[in-house]
Amino acid sequence: MSLSDEAVYKINNTSYEQMVNDLAKPGQAIVDGMNAKAAHILHMSIGIAGEAGELLDAIKKHVIYGKDLDVENVIEELGDLEFYMEGLRAVLSLSRKEILMANKVKLLGKRYASGTYSDEQAKGRADKE
């Protein structure tokens, strides 16, 4: 079924822009409800997303465009990711060891119970059921 341009931009006589305005939480409400801890969590999470994007860009240039891998940049971006992840762990009172152990339990206990990778287990994703 194909929708006309008008149908795409008008749903229940509301423009898409108006729908977004109606459904998105207002910025002031977010700010008003944010304490210092929440602001720090947001800051660290945004940092992780940004640095992950920069790392992905470096990898994209190598894999997609055939450029030499800029290992120095990869090291820098991985270091930046560690910085933000440590900040997030700290504000949440979590240790790196605790997180790595939980991930190991998830991978070996649910996803890859055999202890080795297989396409079948990866597709099954028992940890996501």
Descriptions of predicted regions:
Residues M1-E129:
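Flexible "arm" and connector segments at domain edges
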